[in-house]
Amino acid sequence: MKFSAYLTTLFIVLFSLFIQTVQAESEVRIVIDEGVDSARPIAIIPFKWNGSDSMPIDVADIISADLRNSGKFNPIAVSKMPQKPTSASEVISDVWSSLGIDAVVVGQVTPNEKGYSIAYQLVDTIGASGNSGEVLSQNQYAVPKNAIRLGAHTISDEVFEKLTAIRGAFRTKIAYVVQKNGGSKPYQVRIADYDGHNQFIVYSSSQPLMSPAWSPDGSKLAYVSFENRKSQLIVHDLQSGARRVIAAFPGHNGAPAFSPDGSKIAFASSKDGVLNIYVMNLGNGTISQLTSGAGNNTEPSWSPDGQSIIFTSDRAGGPQIYQMDVVGNGVSLVSAGRGYSGKISADGSILVMIYGDNIVKKDLATGVTEMLSSTFLDESPSISPNGIMIIYSSTQGLGKVLQLVSADGRFKARLPSSDGQIKFPAWSPYLNKN
């Protein structure tokens, strides 16, 4: 399949995924709090516009923002660019390498009847590939008129992977809960691009909604609903809009987490008087209890291989993170101290958690920990599928906002909303095949 056809197909799939949703009144937007001066410099040249009117969206600006958000790159400001080439043949390598910039992205956007044709080239300016001026990566593809941002994120993914050997995650989504300032249904589960654009309402309710969690194929969300004045777990099909209640036991039902193969959901329930971890087989509805005892056990999260579950427990007097196998045996302490809301990266290398009031990363091989945030009352960390970025909620003033931090701590930003408090962010899996 040609890449242009692939990208068009991808757009149709992503659009149909959210076809049952309603576009939200306002969108979250990234506000940079801390930059990446120590990251790898790169130049994203403003793309040439081959239309008679003005370019609807600055493609180069989106690519620059994506690469900056990863914490791996520090795009040079347009005002400091020594030249503004539009093709690889126009790139003068020496003027870029003298600035310490070893890679330059150039491109063009051409409007057509169906949308836009976007072309780019990634140029090596120091000869790391063998020849200075060599094109490391290039592509040309077509996008519908309302998917130009998807085209830009696609370029970002390709450039990021070429330069880091790590798959890009700029075409992923985030789900979260918004509590609006007024209205008959102020609680909403929403989905947006990872950077806050193209926001949609998945479901609205007059009662609280909590803890959205993605299925591994990105087709469903599980979340907590307090409709009918009781907590219940819902699985929501994002394409059809169908909602299925999977747990409505007496007491609290919360913290759903899909297994890596999508066949099971781990959750916490106090149906027997004490909060414990359970696993439900989604095929036949059978439930297994994994924890027991006097302490409260909650916030289950699966290991990437699906062979173990980490969870938060106060069995020792305060919240700590433990790990057990999928039948509840072999319980071990993962992180001592006041730690909770643990998540393991997709490659199994790091644990991200709340420690005290902040986001902390723990290297699971070395045991070394690093504080990534300095915000207030941090909650609900979620890791991008490539392990490069972390999204979480924090308190700002009297409300809750989303925060983005790169896994190395270099880049920090806020995603505030203008129409309510934002909580419980959940990063999607990859939604495209490559």
Curated annotation (Swiss-Prot):
Source organism superkingdom: Bacteria
Presence of the UniProt keyword Amino-acid biosynthesis in the record: no
Predominant localisation class: periplasm
GO cellular component: periplasmic space
GO-annotated biological processes: cell division; protein import
Localization, UniProt: Periplasm
Keyword entries, A-Z: Cell cycle, Cell division, Periplasm, Signal
InterPro entries: 6-blade_b-propeller_TolB-like, PD40, Tol-Pal_TolB, TolB_N
Signal peptide: 1-24
Cystine pairs: none
Family in the record: Belongs to the TolB family.
Quaternary state and interactors: The Tol-Pal system is composed of five core proteins: the inner membrane proteins TolA, TolQ and TolR, the periplasmic protein TolB and the outer membrane protein Pal. They form a network linking the inner and outer membranes and the peptidoglycan layer.
Function description: Part of the Tol-Pal system, which plays a role in outer membrane invagination during cell division and is important for maintaining outer membrane integrity.
NCBIfam families associated with the record: propeller_TolB
UniProt name for this protein: Tol-Pal system protein TolB
Species of provenance: Histophilus somni (strain 2336) (Haemophilus somnus)
